[in-house]
Design a protein with these regions (language model features):
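Enzymes that bind and transform nitrogen-containing heteroaromatic metabolites
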Residues: 1-174
Length: 174
């Protein structure tokens, strides 16, 4: 079974993954559990299926890598930096590096973010699964998930979960 590249992140109802200051404090449910699905999204189970995480320099600077000490982490950057511990800095074509990584034995690959990094993977059309948590908030402005001039990517809804107003949608490429 081949490895998959999986985008997994939260998005506001109007398509933003961070507020205009790069903040995430709006990523909360509405507190209403009346519509919760019986089966719930299990982030820890998701983490068990991956052994590699890909993130951009902004996510790295916010120290998101710290929650992935047991995983291999690739960081896309425009600078030449020395790798250390489980962190690999990629100054170049991150999509090619991750496609090469995908060919190796291992678990799935978590495309963590941010938006510019994800945009390069969308434009390369190499994301196998899209997991998006829709947060019940309209931000009005911020950092968008989807930038312009993307290819059409047809998806099939495989699963969905609702937890306190947050809807998690799990799509696979058709």
């Amino acid at each position: 079974m081949s490895r998959k590249i999986i985008m997994n992140l939260a998005m506001s109802i109007d398509g933003f993954i961070a507020d205009e200051n790069g903040g995430f404090d709006w990523i909360v449910g509405d507190g209403n559990n009346k519509l919760n699905t019986e089966k719930q999204w299990d982030y820890n189970k998701f983490l068990d299926r991956i052994d590699t995480v890909v993130m951009g320099k902004n996510c790295y600077n916010q120290k998101f890598y710290e929650e992935f000490k047991e995983k291999t982490v690739f960081v896309a950057t425009s600078k030449s930096l020395d790798d250390y511990e489980n962190i690999n800095f990629i100054n170049g074509d991150i999509c090619k590096v991750i496609l090469d990584e995908k060919k190796k034995e291992g678990k799935d690959i978590f495309l963590f973010g941010g938006g510019i990094l994800i945009d390069s993977f969308i434009k390369a059309d190499i994301i196998d699964e899209f997991i998006i948590g829709i947060i019940p908030t309209v931000l009005g402005k911020g950092r968008p998930l989807f930038l312009e001039n993307n290819p059409t990517v047809k998806l099939k809804l495989e699963e969905y979960y609702i937890d306190n107003g947050v809807t998690v949608l799990c799509y696979k490429k058709r």
